Regions:
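Gly/serine-rich nucleotide phosphate-binding loop at the start of the catalytic core
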Residues: 1-86
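Acidic carboxylate diad motif detector
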Residues: 59-161
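Secondary-structure transition/turn motif
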Residues: 131-141, 169-174, 199-200, 347
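Short acidic-glycine loop/turn motifs at beta-strand connectors
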Residues: 128, 161-162, 197-200, 327, ...
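Substrate-contacting helices/loops that form the catalytic groove of nucleic-acid
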Residues: 46-75, 153-155, 161-184, 188-297, ...
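Short polybasic amphipathic segments
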Residues: 125-126, 130-136, 192-196, 339-342
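Positively charged, low-complexity nucleic-acid-binding target-recognition regions
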Residues: 2, 6, 175, 286-287, ...
């Protein structure tokens, strides 16, 4: 089917040294505006509440205050910064307060220099050749990407990750996506990143585990460097680059897996995992964090939506692991170390994760009021695409 959607294309930027200085000024100025008006809104509300008439500052009031702020000689440096990006920071702050008052989010936090650095360009962005043109960068910032950047750009988010600069370009797209066929239940795990009810099992990437020894070595070297020294700063960058490599590898892995699943299945049933609860278990906390399940879930959600496919969620506390997928018996003494599920009632024996994924599938089908399907063999096209992407795939 053909649908209209807002898509994002992330490209790496290659700014000149002068442009890097201006980009850093944009990061710092937008961070300053966020913190300044977060403090202003908090103070204004507290003072008005003390007077018995609690009131808040909205976007329009803060926009007016920003204009007044720029007229103060102390803040004349704000004129070097794209005004539209500063306005967008005020809008984002206003949205954060709206989410808080609707109880959808916690109270907005102050931004730190050590946090994610970004600013938003809401309009007036375009591409000229191999350069991205945004306000205050009329000469264009160089980029390299195989993808063609569309003309109808809705918004650009400029970010820095360690020493790399990126532009996330949001644009409207009308594309044809074919809905997959078949229904599958998916069990997320640590021994196997994913086990599907049709027998596909994907080994985990374990991006952090692969870099763990090197990371520990570089962190030991950091502890030996003098605080405030140039060598310590360089060592910090080394460590940040390792974390960057881990994030990049995990993102690439999750994209490949989520794309293959969304492409080949029309209905996917998953379990709503209590990831925060699992991270409190010290024996598996590091492995749970290393999987990147939240990122995978987010990717799968929007890719299924593109295809008008169904993503069904079952509850966290459903007995998917302890239930026999053949007779429904609950095995209360099942241990985490038990990799094979054996039912004493019907003598059914199966891989533990495959048994759980079949239960997840059945629970999802019952939830939407359809009959339980029969077990289907591995779809060869799905397994082939996953293997082609460099992933380690097994069939059960």
């Amino acid at each position: 089917m053909s649908i209209n959607m807002i898509k994002a294309l992330k490209v790496r930027l290659y700014p000149t040294e002068a442009q890097k200085v201006l980009l850093e000024k944009h990061f710092g100025s937008n961070r300053f505006i966020w913190n300044h008006f977060l403090n202003a809104r908090t103070t204004y509300y507290a003072e008005s509440k003390a007077k018995g008439k609690p009131q808040g500052l909205n976007y329009f009031k803060t926009a007016k205050l920003l204009t007044e702020l720029k007229q103060d000689e102390k803040y004349a440096w704000l004129y070097e910064i794209s005004n539209s990006s500063l306005q967008q920071t005020l809008r984002k702050l206003d949205n954060a307060f709206t989410a808080f008052f609707r109880k959808n989010s916690s109270y907005p936090n102050f931004r730190s220099r050590k946090g994610n650095q970004y600013f938003i360009v809401p309009d007036n962005a375009r591409c000229e050749g191999n350069k991205l043109v945004i306000p205050k960068f009329i000469e264009g910032i160089g980029y390299r990407d195989k993808s063609t950047i569309p003309e109808d750009i809705k918004q650009v988010i400029i970010t820095r990750d360690v020493n790399r600069y990126y532009a996330s370009i949001l644009y409207e797209s009308t594309e044809e996506y074919k809905k997959g066929t078949g229904t599958v239940g998916i069990d997320m795990g640590i021994k196997a990143f994913l086990t599907a009810s049709d027998g596909i099992q994907i080994e985990p990437l374990n991006a952090f585990r692969k870099k763990e020894k090197r990371l520990a070595r570089e962190q030991r070297r950091l502890s030996g460097k003098k605080k405030g020294s140039n060598n310590r700063r360089k060592q910090k960058v080394k460590i940040q680059k390792i974390h960057q490599q881990i994030r990049d590898a995990r993102t690439d892995f999750n994209h490949k897996v989520s794309t293959a699943i969304a492409k080949h299945y029309g209905t996917v049933v998953i379990e709503d995992l209590n990831i925060q609860g699992m991270q409190k278990n010290h024996s598996i906390a590091k492995s749970v964090t290393d999987q990147g399940w939240n990122q995978f879930r987010a990717m799968l959600t929007y890719k299924m939506k593109w295809r008008n496919a169904d993503l069904i969620e079952i509850g966290t506390f459903e007995p998917s692991s302890k239930m026999c997928s053949n007779c429904g018996n609950i095995k209360h003494d099942l241990k985490l170390s038990d990799r094979t599920y054996h039912c004493e009632i019907c003598n059914h024996t199966m891989d533990r994760d495959l048994n759980a994924s079949i239960n997840i599938l059945n629970m999802g089908i019952i939830k939407i009021g359809e009959g339980i399907p029969e077990f289907t063999p591995v779809e060869s096209a799905t397994a082939a695409e996953l293997s082609k992407g460099g992933l380690r795939v097994a069939t059960l």
